[in-house]
Amino acid sequence: MKITHITTYRLPPRWMFLKIETDEGVVGWGEPVIEGRARTVEAAVHEFADYLIGKDPARINDLWQVMYRAGFYRGGPIMMSAIAGIDQALWDIKGKVLNAPVWQLMGGLVRDKIKAYSWVGGDRPADVIDGIEKLRGIGFDTFKLNGCEEMGVIDNSRAVDAAVNTVAQIREAFGSEIEFGLDFHGRVSAPMAKVLIKELEPYRPLFIEEPVLAEQAEYYPRLAAQTHIPIAAGERMFSRFEFKRVLDAGGLGILQPDLSHAGGITECYKIAGMAEAYDVALAPHCPLGPIALAACLHIDFVSRNAVFQEQSMGIHYNKGAELLDFVKNKEDFSMDGGFFKPLTKPGLGVDIDEARVIELSKSAPDWSNPLWRHADGSVAEW
């Protein structure tokens, strides 16, 4: 079997799919994208395609190593996202050829279901509470929300009080009936992260995500030393070599590699194993589309340390398309009591509606994140 063609489709809301075709008619799908840099990742995919055309798609490990190591410069969000989507599609092909889901090819199940959590948008406490109520109605009891808006390197007590007030009202409204994590999104400096974490501790969030940027990872163990709340990070780390450093330094309780950013299934399975060796939980990052989610689920079901799975159903970024709009077998992604079951169809287990993909790709928007500024006019972290 040989790879004959690689096609990319930029899609709403902020996704990109790729299709790998073979000379035997077997097709694999992947999702390579950096939100806001889809065209750049697309260019990287097609640079790799020049090498991949004519190669045997079954040699996933060798193709991965060539894509990663054959160029002098390597790593980073663009290249690793391109590799990730290609890698997902290669696993999809292998599973279809062998008539088995990817998790079966990786040794079989370690669990029967995995807890899903849902994003909740909204800047005001009432909006967040209303969003949680609606999501509870469709079976969710675990959530993630923004921990704060933009915050200065040293900010005032009003900014701290606003962040804490939202969390306090959520806990007062729902008690222990729900769990929620708080995503700081790297918006907070190390000094302010110390203040916020201390103030938030009485409300027992499930985790605090990216309290500081990955570039400031030396603060993870220092922040963890002052709190009982697990610290989570990883969505802006792109290879096992970056994760190696933070695992060795300590401090993280939950690792969050992104299956569409960190080298795909091949690399993230290794990252999951590294995390287990350090007794660190796994919760793959996934605010993206259905192929990315499917890839995450296959890792969840073969990794003992996986604890819950992010997914983008109803996320505030989803303008123009929802999580399953490009999927024919929507029923396979249905949840029972807030849990996903293993996908059982061969490969990734996603039956893509290719006609809809082609149609919507003709008018796909170029999504970019907003530009925030502080009151003094300086650029703020989004």
Swiss-Prot record:
Keywords: Lyase, Magnesium, Metal-binding. The keyword Secreted does not apply. Its cofactor is Mg(2+). Mg(2+) binds at D183, E209, E235. SUPFAM superfamilies: Enolase C-terminal domain-like, Enolase N-terminal domain-like. It holds the Pfam family MR_MLE_C. The record marks D258 as: Increases basicity of active site His. Pathway: Carbohydrate acid metabolism; D-galactonate degradation; D-glyceraldehyde 3-phosphate and pyruvate from D-galactonate: step 1/3. Reaction proceeds via an anti dehydration. Catalyzes the dehydration of D-galactonate to 2-keto-3-deoxy-D-galactonate. This is D-galactonate dehydratase. It comes from Salmonella paratyphi A (strain AKU_12601). The gene is dgoD.
